[in-house]
Amino acid sequence: DTQCCGKSTCAREGSTCCCTNCRCLKSECLPGCKKLCCADAEKGKCGNAGCKCGAACKCSAGSCAAGCKKGCCGD
C-alpha cells in the first residue's frame, strides 16, 4: 500500500511526498508532507492537485481549485 503520506510504506515521504490516493488523517502526515495531504485541505485550497480525498477531506463543493476538482469531496 503506497497510498498514504507519512506511512512507512509511502512511495515518497517528506517534502517531496505526493500521494495519488491519500487516505491519511491530518495527524498521520509527516510535517514535511502535511500540506500535500488531503486531510489538510481547507480554506478553498487542496493540498495536492492530483489527490483523491478520503473521509477526512474538508473541501466543500465548489471550493477547490480547478486542478483539484476531480479529487475533492463534494465536487
From Swiss-Prot:
Say which domain of life the source belongs to.
Eukaryota
Recorded GO CC terms: cytoplasm
List the expressing tissues.
Answer: Posterior alimentary canal.
Q: What induces it?
A: By cadmium.
Recite the UniProt keywords alphabetically: Cadmium, Cytoplasm, Metal-binding, Metal-thiolate cluster
Coiled-coil ranges per the record? none
Tell me yes or no: is Repressor among this UniProt entry's keywords. Answer: no
A Pfam family for this UniProt protein? Metallothio_6
| Chain positions listed as propeptide in the UniProt record | 42-75
Which compartment or compartments is the protein found in?
A: Cytoplasm
Which Gene Ontology MF annotations are present? metal ion binding
Q: Using the chain's own numbering, where are the disulfide bonds?
A: none
Q: Does the keyword GTP-binding belong to this entry?
A: no
- Functional note: Metallothioneins have a high content of cysteine residues that bind various heavy metals. Binds 4 cadmium ions per molecule.
Q: What is its quaternary makeup?
A: Monomer.
Instruction: Output this protein's name.
Output: Cadmium-metallothionein
> Which organism is this protein's natural source?
Eisenia fetida (Red wiggler worm)
